Design a protein with these regions (language model features):
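DNA major-groove recognition helix of helix-turn-helix/homeodomain DNA-binding modules
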Residues: 48-63
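Short amphipathic helical patch at the helix-1/turn junction of helix-turn-helix
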Residues: 4, 15-16, 44
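Recognition helix of helix-turn-helix/homeodomain-like DNA-binding domains
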Residues: 29-44
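Short, charged recognition helix plus adjacent turn
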Residues: 63-77
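Short basic helix-loop element that most often maps to the first helix and adjoining turn
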Residues: 8-27, 52
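Conserved hydrophobic/aromatic packing and binding residues within compact polymer-binding modules
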Residues: 10, 24, 35-38, 64
Length: 77
């Protein structure tokens, strides 16, 4: 998981939760074509979109980062 690119992680978590691209688009307010482009790596999501995707997948945005931390509070410190 740590070696996966963001586009691979978006697809992985979406499939793990058995969500279609259309449903993820509805949950996030991001156009379904944009979700598709993120998943195949044509576009990279900006931080705001990544947060919306994380919320739509019901995960922490930290899941998309290739870093290891003890907890989210460590990001602020």
């Amino acid at each position: 998981m740590k070696d996966m690119e963001i586009n691979e992680k978006i697809r992985y978590f979406r499939k793990q939760r058995e969500l279609s691209q259309e449903l993820l688009a509805e949950r996030t307010g991001i156009n379904v074509n944009t979700i598709r482009k993120y998943e195949i790596g044509i576009r990279k999501p900006k931080v705001e979109q990544l947060k919306k995707i994380a919320d739509g997948l019901e995960i922490s945005v930290i899941e998309f980062l290739n870093i290891e931390i003890e907890n989210e509070a460590d990001l602020i410190a």
